[in-house]
Regions:
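Short, surface-exposed "cap/lid" segments of acyl-processing enzymes
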Residues: 71-122
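Conserved hydrolase catalytic core segment
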Residues: 173-183
Length: 237
């Protein structure tokens, strides 16, 4: 092989290696520094509804769950009212991979105390294949939070929201962007980020950006929580 050809091969090899290094560095930088904010989460599009409109919207949600054979019967959205707008109403948002059943007993306690209650099913949750909670999307989460806030707005003169785990992340967002509607928030074990014992802090941007934005294929924790879903809840936080 002549010298000039060897030199060309060496140059091409160096160029390829350098390109791979640069691309890898850019991907790594994107994974760590990609902004967490998402356009759909920068404002709320909820609206204040009358009691009748809120009930109609809630009933449509429950009917949709009832007619959807993929939704487990115990996981349908729950609406319980006293037949009129009450002084206080509360919305409860379940945790990651759970469903409205998680708050059924607490909902009854509030209802018996005179509250109207609404416990909506988070999109992609409560399905016969529970691993499908990993299919949830940021637009679906934003639409869910906005429509649920609209419904609770018509159920009470004073409204609050209770959230557990990822549901507490949603409750945080709802309260932040709907302060004219929501006056109380109870946040139970919010999943703002994994505990240090479970995930080193340097891995959190990877979970948020690579799994939360569906760049990596989904994986599941030992307790069958979707990494993609967890990443999206961190984005909300």
């Amino acid at each position: 092989m002549d010298t000039s050809r060897k030199n060309r091969i060496i140059k091409i090899t160096i160029w390829v290696v350098c390109s791979i290094v640069v691309i890898t560095a850019l991907l790594a930088a994107a994974a760590f520094f990609w902004p967490a904010a998402s356009k759909q989460l920068q404002s709320s599009s909820s609206e204040k509804l009358s009691y009748n409109d809120a009930i109609a919207a809630a009933n449509r949600t429950v009917s949709g769950d009832t007619s959807n054979t993929d939704v487990r019967s115990e996981c349908r959205s729950i609406i319980k009212t006293h037949g009129k707008k009450t002084a206080k109403a509360v919305m409860m948002i379940h945790g990651v991979s759970a469903c409205p059943q998680q708050f059924a007993d607490l909902g009854d306690t509030f209802f018996n105390a005179g509250y109207n209650i609404y416990i909506p099913r988070v999109p992609s949750h409560g399905l016969t294949d529970n691993k499908r909670h990993g299919e949830i999307t940021i637009p679906a989460m934003a639409q869910f939070m906005n429509s649920s806030t609209s419904i609770i707005s018509g159920l009470g003169d004073e409204t609050g929201v209770v959230g557990l785990s990822g549901g507490a992340n949603m409750a945080t967002w709802i309260t932040q962007y709907n302060s004219q509607t929501i006056s109380r928030a109870l946040l139970l074990s919010p999943f703002y980020q994994p505990s240090a014992s479970e995930t080193p802090s340097w891995k959190i941007p990877l979970l948020r950006n690579l799994y939360g934005r569906n760049i990596f294929p989904d994986s599941f924790t030992g307790s069958n929580l979707s990494y993609r879903a967890l990443g999206k809840y961190i984005i909300i936080a």
